[in-house]
Structure formats: structure tokens, C-alpha cells
Amino acid sequence: MSRLPEVMADVDALSGLQRLISVFCDFWAHDHDLIARLHSVGASDPEFSQAVFARNKRRRLALSALVNRMVNSGHVRNAAAPELVDVLLALTSFSFFAELTAGGRPVEIVCRIVQNLSADAVRRASSDTT
């Protein structure tokens, strides 16, 4: 997570998104079992639930900042931005990562899958048809 300031400062928001996804993949993979337990506990423990909610909120803010930069540069339609943020939030979630790694798929491949799906979502948000 120490790479976040550098990633968010990337002048190319599309590149920044790809790099941000790499950061999340590395984070989710670093201590996968512990994070899975925390998410499980968070479902029944209000304090852990608040911590997970706060982390997800920070992730949404980072994604929103990148998407807003894409809108400002003309890469994404303004009307498509809210939905794009929601899709990117789902794609970068621990739950999505855990599903893709559950069968033993390597983290590098999972990261590439998430990056490709995210790039596709951005392309869809840039076109006139969704």
C-alpha cells in the first residue's frame, strides 16, 4: 500500500488504474488467509465490519479520483462514471480476488484478468453505447 501515492500521481489515469489494481492484487495476496478471516469476522463483528467498510470507502475514493480524471481527459463519459466506479469497486474487491484464486490460479494471472476486465469496463464507459 506504500505505492499508492505514486500510483495516484500517475499522469495517465488509465495507467494509474492498472497500477492500482496491481497494488490491490499484491495486498490481497500478501496475507490471503488472514484477510479472509477478517472478512469472515467482519460479517458478525461490528468493529471489524466498520474497518472493512472504511477500507472499501478508501478504495472507492481512489477509484473515483482516477475515473474523474478519465472523465476530465475525455476517456470516459461523465454519465457513465458512477456505474464505472461501482464496477471497478467490485472488480478490485477481496471477494472477487478470492474467487479467482480459489482454484489455485496464480496471483499474476488473477491480476491480469482483473486488469483486462477493468480496461474493458473503461472502454465501455467511453463509448456511446453501454
Question: What positions do the PLM features span?
Answer:
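Short coil/turn helix-boundary motifs
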Residues: 10-11, 31, 45, 103, ...
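Hydrophobic/aromatic-rich alpha-helical bundle segments in the mid-to-C-terminal region
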Residues: 71-117, 125-130
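Amphipathic alpha-helical packing segments from all-alpha helical-bundle domains
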Residues: 22-39, 46-73, 82-86, 111, ...
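Alpha-helix initiation/capping motif
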Residues: 6-13, 41, 52, 56, ...
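Positions in alpha-helical segments
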Residues: 2, 15, 36-37, 50, ...
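Short linear capping/connector segments at secondary-structure termini
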Residues: 2-7, 38-46
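Hydrophobic alpha-helical connector segments
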Residues: 1-30
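Secondary-structure edge/capping motif, primarily at the C-terminal ends of alpha-helices
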Residues: 35-42, 99, 103
